[in-house]
From Swiss-Prot:
Domain of life the protein comes from: Eukaryota
Cell compartments where the protein resides: Cytoplasm, Cytosol
Family, as annotated: Belongs to the heat shock protein 70 family.
Gene Ontology molecular functions: ATP binding; ATP-dependent protein folding chaperone
Upper classification of the organism: Eukaryota, Metazoa, Chordata, Craniata, Vertebrata
InterPro entries documented for this protein: ATPase_NBD, HSP70_peptide-bd_sf, Hsp_70_fam, HSPA14_NBD
Protein name: Heat shock 70 kDa protein 14
Protein species of origin: Xenopus tropicalis (Western clawed frog)
Keyword ATP-binding: yes
Gene: hspa14
Keywords, alphabetical: ATP-binding, Chaperone, Cytoplasm, Nucleotide-binding
Subunit text: Component of ribosome-associated complex (RAC).
Keyword Ribosomal protein: no
Main location: cytoplasm
A Pfam family hit: HSP70
């Protein structure tokens, strides 16, 4: 039985298959190994991938892009509001959740982000089944390290709705290390690996300590203001300037023309990762004018010089945060489509001149390859050359906190499980509640990444406690997080022995 791994990114999706002792990304029906994470709604059909991306110029308000940005988020979430401001689609609020308003003329409907993600997962399932010639259900799915519980739940629900049975969700940096087998070569050795991921809409940098086969995240940071699309936009602006210089027409305010330029710039950007120059041709760009412009790699690098600086600074900041110097890093792993850019690779190499930089697996394929290897391990049908399962231990992605009331009556947050804790893990904490009350509500929050805002994701209520004339209730709280990220919380009144337990599932 084959095993598959799926990576759903903000701009692209990719599926890899583990079979006969190796993991490989498989091509879709268009012959491409990476599929645009774009869904278009037409009068008679729904299209996914390249066809949807190409038809967006004519069908912008019914074509959904970057859906991962709002998966599992509320309508009022700042990420959702940013997505809405950038979207060509109409997004409305339904019961506190964002939904896309689709109007093809034939029908009008409201589509959730989970529905859109389901269609992309279905495309990945079809791609894998076409390559294998048989049905496939079991899958490992990758998630960003800073994904919250609600986001993971939404991602899991979308995959399940597409017909997948989720074996496990693993963090993207862990999948990247698995793809290169990092940790298996010297299972008793210790090393530090920097995982650099430049995706379509964000940049993340993670430093992982590999020790005795265990991954431990030392630090991670994510930046949502820089991504591959920024390079595309910069090149599109340059092309618009060239058009104005040649034809004395400023098209920057014309949404349709700029979308055409964005498509051409995106193709050129990818080509310039392997070629010295690329030709940008747009048929009938504006007012019937065909636009033709050649862009060299050197010109592209000059246009994007400030963006390259933005992409390198986060590495320096993260190393400074954990007190590392460049020579404290043993390996650098490149992930994400824009990590293919030669100039960026050179700048990273300049930062780590003595460090091995791993890019033999295409950066936009390394994460799904690692996920497929993990799937192969879990299914256990393949004869693996090494015991890779010894290095698949995950870490908690965010701080898990409990809200308490201090002596002054003010709320305070106590960290029960710090981010980066190797899983599985078990922690306990004694919560004190006023003796005159007969019930205690324990609220759990998560806080991760750079945001200081805690997010409540669960609560547990302990009822029918014996009231006390004086003193406090001592409530023993035990939190257990399994390797798959599921949380099991038990609260016990130490006096009466009354107990309640809840489980917050990471995967369906």
């Amino acid at each position: 039985m084959a095993a598959i791994g799926v990576h759903l990114g903000c701009t692209c999706a990719c599926v890899a298959v583990y079979k006969d002792g190796r993991a490989d990304v498989v091509a879709n029906d268009a012959g491409d190994r990476v599929t645009p994470a774009v869904v278009g709604f037409l009068e008679k059909e729904t299209i996914v991938g390249l066809a949807a991306k190409q038809s967006r110029v004519r069908n912008a308000t019914n074509t959904i892009v970057k859906v991962k940005q709002i998966l599992g988020r509320s309508y009022g979430d700042p990420h959702t509001q940013k997505h809405i401001s950038e979207s060509k689609c109409i997004v409305v609020e339904k019961v506190g959740k964002p939904k896309y308003e689709i109007d093809t003329g034939e029908t009008q409907k409201f589509v959730s982000s989970e529905d859109v993600a389901k269609l992309i997962f279905s495309k990945m399932k079809e791609t894998a089944q076409s390559a294998l010639g048989s049905d496939v259900n079991d899958v490992v799915i990758t998630v960003p390290f800073d994904f919250g519980e609600s986001q993971k739940k939404a991602l899991g629900e979308a995959a399940t709705a597409a017909g997948f049975s989720i074996l496990r969700m693993i963090h993207e940096p862990s999948a990247a290390l698995l793809a290169y087998g990092i940790g298996q070569e010297s299972p008793t050795g210790k090393s530090n690996v920097l995982v650099y991921k430049l995706g379509g809409t964000s940049l993340s940098v993670t430093v992982i300590e590999v020790n005795s086969g265990i991954y431990r995240v030392l630090a991670t940071s994510t930046y949502d203001d820089i991504g591959g699309i920024c390079f595309t936009e910069a090149l599109a602006q340059h092309l618009a300037s060239e058009f104005q210089r040649t034809y004395k027409q400023d098209i920057r305010g014309n949404a349709r023309a700029m979308m055409k330029l964005m498509n051409s710039a995106d193709v050129a950007k990818h080509a310039l990762s392997t070629l010295g120059s690329s030709n940008c041709f747009v048929d009938s760009l504006y007012d019937g004018i065909d636009f033709d412009c050649n862009v060299s790699r050197a010109r592209f690098e000059l246009i994007c010089s400030s963006l390259f600086n933005q992409c390198i600074d986060p590495i320096k900041k993260l190393l400074e945060q954990i007190g590392f110097k460049a020579n404290d890093v043993n390996q650098v792993v490149l992930c994400g489509g824009s990590a293919r850019i030669p100039k960026l690779q050179q700048l990273i190499k300049d930062l780590f001149p003595e460090v091995e930089m791993l890019s033999s697996i295409p950066p936009d394929e390394v994460i799904p390859v690692g996920a497929a290897i993990q799937a192969g391990i879990l299914i256990g049908k393949e004869n693996l050359s090494t015991d890779l399962d010894t290095i698949t231990i995950e870490c908690s992605a965010s701080d898990i906190l409990v809200k308490e009331t201090d002596e002054s009556g003010d709320n305070k947050f106590t960290v029960l499980l710090p981010s980066g804790t190797p899983l599985p893990a078990r922690r306990q904490h004694v919560l004190q509640a006023p003796g005159h009350i007969s019930s205690v509500c324990l609220e759990l929050y998560e806080s991760g990444g750079k945001s200081p805002v805690e997010s409540k994701f669960a609560q547990i209520v302990l009822k029918d406690l014996q009231k006390k004339a004086s003193g406090v209730h001592d409530i023993l709280t035990v939190l257990t997080m399994k390797r798959d990220g599921s949380l099991h919380i038990t609260c016990t009144d130490k006096d009466s022995g009354k107990s309640e337990m809840i489980t917050v599932e990471e995967t369906p």
